[in-house]
Amino acid sequence: KWPNQWEVTDPVTGVGIGRSTMVAFTTNETVLSRAEAYVHLKEYDKAVADLNAWIGSFYLVGQNGIESLTRERIAEVYGDPSSDRYIAEYTALEPTSRKPLHPHGFTVEAGEQEHLIQTTLFCRRIETIADGLRWGDIKRYGIVIDRFDDSAYNDDNTTGFTVAATLGEKDLRRALQLPQEVITAGLEANPR
């Protein structure tokens, strides 16, 4: 994700230092943030256009079975249980990419708005993997996180996963703890 760049420090001996550059704001992540904003403004066509721009940065749409998104296709995936493409809501027994949303301080309407938010969150999850940005989505939408114990996993039938811990929608651990120096100086720590 972050390419390694070699900087030669001594050309005679060929010694150098490997460096990686992490870009704070990528175009792709910014486009997905704008798509999310368009969904909240109910400008769904603009949101889908941004989602398609993001997809186009990875894939040649129209080739090898890659299709562009439409509002109808998104509704089929998230709203039509009879469709082969339908994604059911996440449960611990049947994990999927479609998480129940419990937004804090705003609402997400059932139907098209929720479908587009789910699509955008899934794209953001792919785009921001290993960047540490998923936490903002988890907190903002109150997404419940299950941690699985796979010690009894059976590769033959993919069974044996059990939920070891859950971070609930109103779990106090969602608030980051204040630094110890601040607590020592007299500020009350965030409750746990």
Regions found by a protein language model. Name each.
Residues 1-192:
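Acidic/polar-rich alpha-helix caps and helix-coil junctions
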